[in-house]
Amino acid sequence: MIETLARYSNMDITMTATGDNDHHLIEDVAITLGKTFAKALDGSPIERMATATVVMDDALIMTSLDRVDRPYCETDCPDPIYTHFFRSFAMSAAISLHIVQFRGFDDHHIIEASFKSMGMALKSAVRPRETELSTKDKVMEA
């Protein structure tokens, strides 16, 4: 799924990871990716908010996110380990992340469509802007 996220977000992700169990491994990967994502943005003005919808066979998934430094995550993911991945990523990346399942019965399709739509939303959210998109002077302090 990391390869799927990389492809759909247009991010270059290369990593090697080992862990004492699946839960810790997936959590550590999500935290590392989230922190790296946050650091890479370096305070430059970006679109910040984005939504992407993906259909994959029976699954119809929408991801909406906001890079606003008030982390939150809500997901309809059918597998607790992937739910934990999304939450760990959102908290570490300082994003508000919502992944909504409109349709679907095959867990694999739901999970893969979730990673695809999150990747597409991340790609759109990091597009550069000339000015910060906020009604406040500054959304985040460096």
Positions of predicted regions on the chain:
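Polyanion-binding surfaces on beta-sheet-dominated domains and ring/shell assemblies
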Residues: 2-142
